[in-house]
């Protein structure tokens, strides 16, 4: 077997917020990738606007550095469970991995998932205990917990023999022993050269598995992946083997490799390289691009099943078409099906209604990122409340179940216990550090997590962190009754006035400001009772020919509650929708007319 000793391919994997992207920043900066006078932002790999806003990695990305004459291809992966499909998709390009574990939090749900994926692929692991500069760091305990995780997941005895490094990605230092003085990030790079095996070069003609796609308005589709056999050059002929076994022949236009944040145009790339090629138009992630003389397909990428679903529909509100650039069924359908090309965890199905589509994903965040992306692109549509995806196994209804881990303070245990018991959660473990901080671990149905994140943040007053990961399927435990209060629903269309809002605020909280355009059936607030209340938010104060000296003093209003997209999705009930446009996020009833809603309630009672 031939090896390419001039290359190492390594993936950086971890739970969300354990410091992957910050560590990549340090590797890039200390490898002299940037000019000395060049300003470089933090988390430079998270170039997407939503990634920067939310502080998480959403899409996996490739970069490369040169160190001691060896090119190190680095694959930065997401840490959030909702984007675990990205990890499954790209981890096959690597020969080794850096597993980052927070020195305080220790192994978390996604740590187990990403390590399991790495072990199944046979990657050589390097454990990096990150954020060692934290005062609360508990090194020995975290190392023991991580070693137990390796013992549970290792598929070969070799995977139990791994080095341990200690790092502070924010400070750009790493060390092989605790107590050493960290000077730079070089110990990690030296360990990669020593531990991660060089790519094995199998004999044969060109063969590449497409693990990612990009698009350029001038170059068209860009296929990204690792070359497993042979070599490729511009103007070479190749065939693309898709999931159906069909083969289409193309001529390669350009071949790129990675260095820093750039793609470099090259005349030739060989087995072991991670490349991007143009000229292959009809290609999907998981396809094999190969030599026409020997078109052998590589095993396709297997991605886990989605766990929640919701409908996307054409906007049917009275304000439809006013604020969006893309509003039609054709445009919405084309955009959703186009997303399938690079978002492997997503599923899209047509429904009986021509203007409504069923979209399935790995979690609320997974789908909300898609919704927000489409909103910013100019799409206008409406979405329903998410639901857990059930399936029937041997005649029994099964539902997805997840592990929920919460870090908070002792004072929040009571309220969280009450909230989660109403959502069919079972407490499986609890750890108290003796300083007022607790770690709670629950097993909970996915349906019990829908809408919980917003309530969790409110109950803990922001003093808590929650993480989840899917465990599998268990028998259906029954429906969960909504505990949400009733809403205030606009009974007339028009412009919301201060007098009308003041009247509404006597009944509850409002969601809109004065001078907001509203329509009948739009949700404008909430109150404490369980029933919905129709209210005329456009009501004016009656005029008389007699005025007192204080009659025209302006009305004092409580500031409106403004929902983010995620909060709006969490808030709605089954009979409600979120109207999404580039300019506004509105809540509404599915049936806008008050009389239609009454008839619907009456007919359901008769059916019961």
Predicted regions and their residues:
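P-loop NTPase switch module centered on the Walker A-proximal segment
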Residues: 1-101, 105-107, 141, 145, ...
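Interdomain boundary/hinge elements
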Residues: 39-43, 153-165, 199-209, 245-258, ...
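Canonical P-loop GTPase G-domain recognition
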Residues: 124, 134-194
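Short glycine/threonine-rich beta-strand-turn micro-motifs
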Residues: 168, 351-366
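Conserved nucleotide-binding/hydrolysis modules and their immediate coupling elements
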Residues: 207-310, 320-322, 485, 494-543, ...
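Helix N-cap motif at beta-to-alpha junctions
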Residues: 231, 281-282, 361-367, 409-413, ...
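Long insertion/accessory domains within large nucleic-acid-processing enzymes
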Residues: 258, 263-266, 398, 444, ...
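A short, contiguous, amphipathic alpha-helix enriched in charged residues
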Residues: 317-340, 554, 558
